[in-house]
A protein has these predicted regions:
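Active-site entrance/lid segments in N-terminal catalytic domains of soluble metabolic enzymes
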Residues: 13-192
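Generic low-complexity, intrinsically disordered sequence content enriched
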Residues: 11-13, 17, 113, 219, ...
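Conserved active-site-proximal phosphate/metal-binding subdomains
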Residues: 179-192, 200-341
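Gly/Ser-rich catalytic serine loop of serine hydrolases
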Residues: 36, 196-201
Length: 341
């Protein structure tokens, strides 16, 4: 499989040695997003073996000890893969919920520091001290945002990249269209831009780069892979759904997120209830993990990109397909450009 060159579409990655080293082993400019309850070491390992960044939430393991076991499992599997094949796998990443009431965040960060996790994705808080710790061992920190104000705070914290969660993304999505969101953020941030929202095929990846992103962030597409921990009924519902079946509501967990309408209806949640809002209350870490898990286990999240998902391949089947579509889309764009020059 052809390797991607170090990305430099926006003139940033080629100037940052850490970024350049991080991405030189990619086959495709894609990060498989950390999916709550769904991403496990199996998915991360297969993503990295196939040349895209694999990630998972630290809270997918209920204890820090279990989390460390997963990190070790991933590192060992990727080291063995490189030894046996001579091919350097793509790097992996961990999502940390950086919130004052997450009492596990320091312990989980200590694990990341100990094992030098290449990429840390922070949510619900951009903390300079975390950035410093990760930079000291040579890692990168990306922070997910839904609006310019969040981007400004993350930029001040010194993060290496911003994940722009645009309208239509699965999970805790924003409400802004990707084009104005990218344009707003690029006014105040000159490092790596990662775009999330409705990216399900290779053409979508090419479109994300054309809009000004450096990397595509794909979540819903990876719910429907064989290595996913999602239930078969969940995968079937995604394949049967369209963009109109996605409901944006705070009724499930107190924070606005996108969910599958049939899943809400199956739990007896009415349209009136979708419009209810609740104040966010994370409680302690175990409460956060358990309460969120209970909600998201029975009510399934997905983005509007479901409209393009009609299968459930293995990651080793999906990545080459995405690459073929991506290359075809870029070639088509080049031919179109030639028409006007």
């Amino acid at each position: 499989m052809m390797r991607c060159q170090p990305l430099s579409l926006n003139g940033q990655l080629k100037e940052n040695k850490m970024d350049k080293d991080f991405y030189k082993s990619l086959d495709l400019p894609v990060i498989a997003a950390p999916l709550f309850l769904i991403s496990g070491p199996e998915m991360v390992i297969e993503c990295c073996k196939n040349g895209i960044v694999g990630t998972f939430p630290a809270l997918n393991q209920r204890t820090t000890e279990g989390f460390e076991d997963w990190v070790i499992q991933i590192k060992d599997a990727l080291a063995l893969f490189e030894k046996e094949t001579g091919k350097k796998p793509a790097p992996f990443g961990v999502n940390l919920i950086v919130h004052p009431t997450n009492i596990r965040v320091k312990a989980d960060l200590d694990v990341c520091e100990k094992h030098k996790v290449p990429l840390i994705i922070t949510s619900l808080g951009a903390v300079p001290q975390i950035v410093d710790i990760v930079h000291n061992y040579g890692g990168l920190v990306y922070h997910d945002i839904i609006k310019k104000r969040h981007a400004e705070k993350a930029s001040e914290a010194g993060v290496d990249g911003l994940i722009l969660v645009a309208a239509g993304a699965g999970g805790h999505a924003g409400t802004l269209h990707p084009i104005p969101l990218i344009n707003e953020v690029k006014k105040i941030f000159s490092k790596t831009i990662v775009l999330s929202g409705c990216l399900s095929n290779g053409n979508d990846i090419a479109s994300a780069l054309q809009m000004g992103a450096d990397i595509a962030y794909m979540g819903t597409r990876f719910i429907n892979v064989k290595e996913s921990r999602a239930e078969d009924n969940y995968k079937d519902m995604i394949m049967q759904s369209s963009a109109e079946d996605i409901v944006y509501t705070a009724a499930v967990s107190g924070v606005n997120a996108n969910f599958l309408r049939p899943s809400l209806e199956a739990m007896g949640i009415t349209e009136e209830q979708w419009k209810d809002t609740k104040k966010i209350n994370f409680g302690n870490t175990s409460d956060l993990a358990e309460s969120e898990a209970k909600a998201w286990k029975t009510i399934w999240s997905a983005g509007q990109g479901v409209t393009s998902i009609k299968d459930s391949p293995s990651i080793s089947e999906l990545v080459p397909m995405l690459k073929e579509e991506f290359v075809f889309a870029l070639d088509k764009q080049k031919k179109l450009l030639d028409t006007y020059t």
